[in-house]
């Protein structure tokens, strides 16, 4: 994760921060950008907030306090849901506009991962939730060389016509 580049992109977009949230490893975008360990089941909610300026903050459940330990920033630990909400509100501070994996009217379903209840919760703090789609496009890992080799292998195995192969390889 390139924290300075993310923070610069947030400032350029006029966003106060980017709030990542996950439960049960549902947000593959967050997992890839933040390099989360998805081999261990996430049974509790966690949050990671990258402000446009300043130190990131993480909010994790007491049962899984290690969840975001590899990420920079201050760690807050919650147990009851009331504490989770009050710490989350405090973590967002004076933020007015925060990006999340949300897409208005589900226009980009690939990015529309955050559930409506979580969006409502963040809005209840007086924070506008905006789509992280542009940020995701900029910071999510793209195909590695190994993945490209797999795709080329698929093309070679599945297509017989050399013109079709050339066309598909040009797209890849």
Q: What residues fall within each predicted segment?
A:
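Flexible, acidic/His-enriched mid-domain "rim/lid" segments that flank
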Residues: 1-4, 82-172
